[in-house]
Amino acid sequence: MLTIALSKGRILDDTLPLLAEAGIVPTENPDKSRKLIIPTTQDDVRLLIVRATDVPTYVEHGAADLGVAGKDVLMEYTGQGLYEPLDLQIAQCKLMTAGAIGAAEPKGRLRVATKFVNVAKRYYAEQGRQVDIIKLYGSMELAPLIGLADKIIDVVDTGNTLRANGLEPQELIATISSRLVVNKASMKMQHARIQALIDTLRKAVESRHRG
C-alpha cells in the first residue's frame, strides 16, 4: 500500500491533476467527503487528508509514504527523515516580511509576529539582528496595526490583504511552491514504485510548464 498525505485547499486542487497523470484518482471528491482516508482508482494507493502543517510529520514517521507540502511548511519543520525530490511548481507565493506603509525601520530590538517562528529566528540570526518573536496563528496583519509587533513574516500571494490593512511587503525571505516529500525508509523499501511515480510527476510538471 502506498499512502500519500495531502492537505485540502489550493495544494490539493493543484496536486490531483498531477496524480491523475500517474493514474491515481480519488474514488470520491476529497473536498466534499468527510473521510480522511480516501481510496483511489489504484487499489494499492490511498490518500490521507491532513492539516498542511502536519504533512511532513506524517511522512517522516512513516504514516504516509509520500506527501505534498509547501516549502514554507518544510522550512519551518525541524524534523528529519524526509527526501524532497521534486518541486511541483504549484501553489506558488512568497514568504516575506511586511510592515506599516511608509514606516521607518525600527531601531534597536525588533518585534516580529509570525507563525513561522523557526524561519524568523534563522532569518534574523543571519542578519545579526536582535528580535523578539511573537507567535500568532492567524490575522497577522493586526499585529503592526495595534502595536503588538513592528513587522510580520507571512506568506504573500497578491499582497492585496496587506495593502487593505495599511501594510506593505518588504523583504523577500523565500519563493515558495509545493514540494513532493518522501519518507526515507519508504524510498528504500518501495524504491521502484516511488521512483516511477516521481518520474511521472516530473514529466507532468515539465509538460504543464512547456504548455
Swiss-Prot record:
CDD domains the UniProt entry points to: PBP2_HisGs
Reaction catalyzed: 1-(5-phospho-beta-D-ribosyl)-ATP + diphosphate = 5-phospho-alpha-D-ribose 1-diphosphate + ATP
InterPro entries: ATP_PRibTrfase_cat (IPR013820), ATP_PRibTrfase_CS (IPR018198), ATP_PRibTrfase_HisG (IPR001348), ATP_PRibTrfase_HisG_short (IPR024893)
UniProt keywords, alphabetically: Amino-acid biosynthesis, ATP-binding, Cytoplasm, Glycosyltransferase, Histidine biosynthesis, Nucleotide-binding, Transferase
Listed pathway(s): Amino-acid biosynthesis; L-histidine biosynthesis; L-histidine from 5-phospho-alpha-D-ribose 1-diphosphate: step 1/9
Gene Ontology biological process terms in this record: L-histidine biosynthetic process
One of the Pfam families matching this protein, by short name: HisG
Keyword field contains Manganese: no
Compartments reported by the entry: Cytoplasm
PROSITE patterns reported for this sequence: ATP_P_PHORIBOSYLTR
Gene3D superfamilies: Periplasmic binding protein-like II
SUPFAM superfamilies: Periplasmic binding protein-like II (SSF53850)
NCBIfam families tied to this protein: hisG (TIGR00070)
Subunit structure: Heteromultimer composed of HisG and HisZ subunits.
PANTHER family: ATP PHOSPHORIBOSYLTRANSFERASE, ATP PHOSPHORIBOSYLTRANSFERASE ATP-PRTASE
Recorded family membership: Belongs to the ATP phosphoribosyltransferase family. Short subfamily.
UniProt protein name: ATP phosphoribosyltransferase
GN (gene name): hisG
